[in-house]
Design a protein with these regions (language model features):
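N-terminal signal-anchor module of multipass membrane proteins
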Residues: 1-66
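Long, contiguous internal "core" modules enriched in hydrophobic/ aromatic residues
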Residues: 13-30, 36-42, 136-316, 404-407
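TerminUS-proximal long segments
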Residues: 13-15, 125-130, 311, 320-415
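Non-cytosolic membrane-interface motifs at loop->transmembrane helix junctions
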Residues: 50-56, 85-87, 216-227, 365-377
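Hydrophobic cores of alpha-helical transmembrane segments in multi-pass inner/ER membrane proteins
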Residues: 62-71, 101-102, 149-161, 229-244, ...
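Hydrophobic alpha-helical membrane-insertion segments
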Residues: 94-112, 269-278, 343-350
Length: 415
């Protein structure tokens, strides 16, 4: 029966055209933003260009990397329900090295280049005359930042590649019982290694280095978990979009509404978790009213005497990423409806893009919110890149891990 499945993905010509077209839009947006801002001799003006690149690259890197976290977490939990669409998740995670290289180049230019408007702590003269930066210089310094970034992106890349390679080891033959046990054990061990790296990076140090240090005098102990929740729910939304897309083309016959329901549950649950962290971080800092901490939110929403330039996006962020999932995804039927879950997935991806925008852009433009369409254009370019790389990865290997020991569990999955 398995031989009748559409097990090989053929990239539609129209899909290729769209992905290349979106990348062209992104490249054009980069060029326009460079001409209008990036090439300006005033560092405060050119910082606007680099902030747009930083925001988009970090957001999409963390989002595609979250898909590998999903694979490893479900592997450790022996969650076989996701095996029927695992190859989709693996294909998305194959974007990590490509976007990782782009992100690395941007970060290195910002840290080692002449413009230190975004990362003030990277300027030796600024550190020399700032007691707070000098105190934090053991952690916030260019050498440690570079080494940590190389280890992080390199580790995600190599471990992700290893896990994807192991997944395809049984494509050509059915394993014996002993081989199946060994296969499960090896996958469990390597997934555990990846989870440890993920915990040490995404759940702790990397958001501090890449994003929180944009406001080097400010800190929040919830910041890394906040970033994890935002990127993970976006990653689940991205998986859902690709699964529905392939289902509509007649692929993934063994994936059904039961699997979509669980993907929707993840989106709903982590939208609520994100909101819990959003509220806790905001409420504790705002009502404690310590000037060194409230400055982060005053810069975005203002205080009693004035309205902040990012006030609209700050509250829109909460509406899209909390109220919309709460009101729409709470109902069982909405998580099982292809149209509704796809619409919500796209909305969540955009909502958390906005979340990262309001995290990054105030560091470059604290007094006004820049024209956002060019930033969106760059984001569209990254979407096209993800579409292109994911499709190429899907086309290289069978869409079904047909000899995986847990495949039966995925076939009979019911929720």
């Amino acid at each position: 029966m398995a031989s009748t499945f559409k097990d090989r993905f053929e990239i539609p010509k129209r899909y290729n055209t769209w992905s290349i077209g979106l990348m062209a839009v992104g490249l054009l947006s980069v060029i326009i933003l460079f001409i209008t801002h990036g090439s300006n001799a005033d560092q405060h003006v050119s910082a606007r260009f680099w902030a747009a690149l930083l925001q988009n690259s970090v957001y999409f890197l963390l989002t595609v990397n979250a898909t590998m976290f999903f694979i490893t977490a479900t592997t450790l939990a022996w969650g076989g329900w996701q095996i029927s669409f695992r190859r989709v998740t693996e294909a998305i995670s194959a974007c990590v090295p490509v976007i990782g290289v782009i992100t690395f180049v941007i970060l290195m230019v910002l840290v080692w280049g002449p413009n230190h408007v975004l990362y003030h702590w990277a300027d030796p003269q600024a550190v020399e005359h700032d007691a707070a930066l000098k105190f934090k210089s053991g952690f916030l310094n260019r050498g440690f930042f570079t080494v940590a970034t190389i280890i992080t992106i390199g580790g995600w890349w190599l471990l992700g590649r290893k896990i994807r390679h192991m997944s395809r080891a049984l494509d050509d033959r059915k394993p014996t019982i002993e081989e199946g046990k060994r296969y499960i054990w090896d996958n469990t061990v390597w997934s555990a290694v990846y989870i440890v790296l993920f915990a040490l990076t995404v759940m702790s140090s990397i958001p501090w280095l890449w994003l929180m240090s944009l406001n080097a005098h400010w800190y929040s102990t919830m910041y890394s978990w906040y970033n994890f929740a935002s990127s993970f729910v976006a990653g689940m939304a991205l998986i859902t979009v690709f699964v529905v897309f392939l289902k509509n083309l007649g692929y993934l016959e063994l994936t059904n509404r039961e699997h979509l329901h669980d993907l929707g549950k993840f989106q709903f649950a982590f939208s609520i978790f994100w909101t819990y962290l959003w509220f806790s971080q905001f409420m504790l800092i705002w009502y404690a009213n310590i000037p060194e901490e409230t400055v982060y939110f005053i810069q975005r929403i203002g205080d009693g005497s004035h309205s902040g330039p990012y006030r609209g996006i700050f509250w829109l962020n909460l509406i899209i990423n909390f109220l919309a999932p709460l009101l729409i995804l709470m109902k069982r039927g909405s998580k099982r409806n292809y149209g509704t879950i796809t619409m919500m997935s796209v909305l969540i991806l955009f909502g958390h893009w906005l979340d990262y925008y309001q995290m990054v852009m105030p560091a470059a433009a604290p007094d006004h919110m820049p024209f956002i369409l060019l930033d969106m254009g760059i984001g569209v370019g990254f979407v096209g890149l993800i579409m292109f790389v994911t499709a190429k990865s899907l086309a290289k290997h069978p869409l079904l891990a047909r000899n995986h020991p847990f495949l039966k569990e995925s076939i009979i999955h019911h929720t």
